Amino acid sequence: MLLAFQAGEGQRRIGAEAEWFRGLLAFPYTNRLDELPLAPPYARARYPFSFTYNGRPSDTLLPVWPTASGSNDLGGGVATSWRAWTDPATGLRVRFESRCHQGFPDRDWVLYFENTGSRDTPVIENIQALDLTLATPLEGDASYRLHRTKGAPADPTDFEPAIVPLKAGQTERLSAGGGRSSNRDFPFFKVETGEGSLIIAVGWSGQWAAALNSPDRHHLRVTAGQEQTHFILHPGERVRSPRILLFLHRGDTWEANARFRQLIYRYYAAKRNGRTPLPILFCNTCFTRGGGWLNECNASNQISLIQAYAPLGLEALITDAGWFEGGWPAGAGNWTPRHDAYPLGMAPVAAAAAAHAMIYGLWFEPERVVAGTEFHRLHPDWVLTDGRPGQTTLLANFGLREVQEHFFTIVKGFMALPGFRFYRQDFNMDPLDYWRHNDAPDRQGITEMRYIEGLYAYWDRLAATWPDGLREECASGGRRIDLETLQRMPLHQKSDYWFDNEVDQASLWSLSQYLPNSLVTAPLTRLDDYSFRSTLAASLIPAWIADAPGFDLERARKLLDRYRAVRHLLVGAWYPLLPYSRSARDWMAVQFHRPDLGEGMILLFRHAESPYRTVEVALRGLKAERNYALSFDNSGETQRVRGADLMSHFLLSLDARPGSELITYREIAERHHQ
C-alpha cells in the first residue's frame, strides 16, 4: 500500500534529502548561512527550536549546558533519537525527542521541559517548537512560496487552499482558532524552496501558531509552537511542546504531497487491530434526516435502520447526539440514556447491530458541560469557566486525572455491551478563553498544556483498551484535525457543512493534499452518480432513509459495491488534475494512484454552468512505456492507452451539466514472446 520508489534516481533523492535532515539535527547547526553573501545575523539559527529562559535566548544557553544523547531503532521502520540539555544552576532539563521513518525524507520531534531541581524555575517563555531559517530561495520575484489551507468554519470555504508568494519583508501567520487546531487554519502547510518542497505539520490539538517571515530575498524564518507560553515549573514538573513534522521532497511539488500522504498512512494514521484501515463504510443516523435527527431517535427507529442497512454490508451504525437525559444540546453532562427513548438502555440497539454483523456506537461530548447537568452537580471542582458571570457552558478539565478516569469509566460501561465498539467524540465550544482564564500570570500556557496532555492520555487509553474499536473525532465538524488527532482517531468528520456536492468536491480536494482519504468522513444522502462521486473520496457515510417504503435498495447496493471496489485507491498517491474550484463554471478533476498495484482512478466533474464540454488533463505517476486499460463507468467503455499519452494529453468529455465520470485504470502486463 506504500508508494514504492525506483532504485537509482529515487534512492539518490532520498539520500540527498536525508543528508539535509542530518545537517538540521547536527546541533548546533547553521544551515549553511555563512556560505551566502550578506547573511544577516538575525537569520542565523543554531537549533531547529527556540525558547527564552530567565530572559536569555536558548541559542546562547544550550551550547554551554551539559548534554546527553542517545538513539534507538524501534523496528517497523521507525528510528528515534534524543538529546537533553540541563541547566546546572536551576535544574531545568530540555529534552528533544525525534524520530524518522524508513524510506521517507522526514523528521518529527517534541520538546520536553522538566524541572529536576528543588525550587521553582525562572520563567520559560516564547517556546517555538520549530524555529528554522531556510537559505535556499526560489528564483524570480518570490523567493519562497507558501501553500496554506484554511480551517473548517462550517461554510463553503472549509479547507480552501491558497498559494502565497513570500516576498522580502513579508510575514504570513497561521494559527488555530479559539483553541481548536483546525478551526482557523489547517495545521499542514508547504513551502516551496530552492532546495525542494518542505511540508510542515503541527501536532497540537489546542492553540498553535506559526509565522513565516522573509526578511530579505535569501532567507525565510519559519516558527511554530503553542501560541502563548510564559511560565515557571515547580519541582518535578514536566510539560511538552507541540509535535513538529518536517518532510522535504526534491522534485515536483505535487509529488511531495503524494509521498507525504504515504508517510501519514503508514506511520501516523491511527490503527485498528494493529493495521491502518482502508476507508470505512458506516451510517451516522442523524444524517438520514438532514443532520438534525437527534432527540427524535429512539431504540425502535435505530433498530429499524440497522435492519434496513444490513443487506448493504455496512461496518457500523451509530446514534448521534440526543440519546442522553436532557437531550441535545442541553443534556451534555448527563451520560445516561433517556428512559423515554431507550427504556432498556442501549443494549438492545447494540445487540441488533451485532446480529447483523455490524458494530454500534454513540456520540459523546465529554469536554463540554452544561451547567446543572449531572457532571456539574456532582463534580463542580472538575470544570473550568472563562470568568464570565452566569456561565452556562463549562469545560471539563481534562488536565485532571479524575476527569479522564470518570469518562473512561462511562465509555467502558457502554463498550461492555455486546456489539458496542464505536466511539464518536464531538466538541462544540472554543476552550481557549477557559484555559487562559485559569492561568496564573507566571503560569501562562500551563492549563492548556495539561488539558491537551490529559486528552491524549484519555484517547490513548481508549485505543489501547479496545484495539478493535472505531473512533471518530468531530469538533463542530472538522475543527480539530491535526497530526496528534490523526494518530489517535481513525476517522475525522471533515465539516459541519453538508450535502453540497461542489463543496464536498472542493474540501476533499484540499484535504487530499496531505491526508489519505480514509481519515475523513463525508455523508451521502442521495442516490445519483454525481452526488456519490462528490463524496466518494472519504470514509463514506451512507445517510439514506433505508427503511422508508420504496427505498431503492438495489441502487444503493450498486453504489456501495462500486465504492468497495475502488476505496483501496484512496490511500495511495493523490494528484490534482485541475485546480481547486467551487465555481459553477469550472471543472474539477483528481487522480488517485497506487504505484504498488499499477492501478488508479480519476474523478471528473463538470459543474452546472460550465460552457465547456471537453477538458484536457495530464495524469501523473504512470510508466510512460507501458499500456494501461481504462474503464469508463458512465458508458462501460474500455480503452487501451500508453502511459506517455495519458501523461501528456488526455481529452475527456461530459455532456451533462452538472456531470461526472469515474474512470479506473490498470497497467497491462506485457507478454514476452520467445
Predicted regions and their residues:
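Hydrophobic faces of well-ordered beta-strands that scaffold small-molecule active sites
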Residues: L281-N284, L317-T319, Y360-F364, Y423-Q425, ...
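Short Pro-Gly-centered flexible turn/kink motifs
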Residues: F231-R250, P658-R666
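Active-site-adjacent "subsite" loops/lids of carbohydrate-active enzymes
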Residues: L278-F282, G290-N298, H339, E365-G413, ...
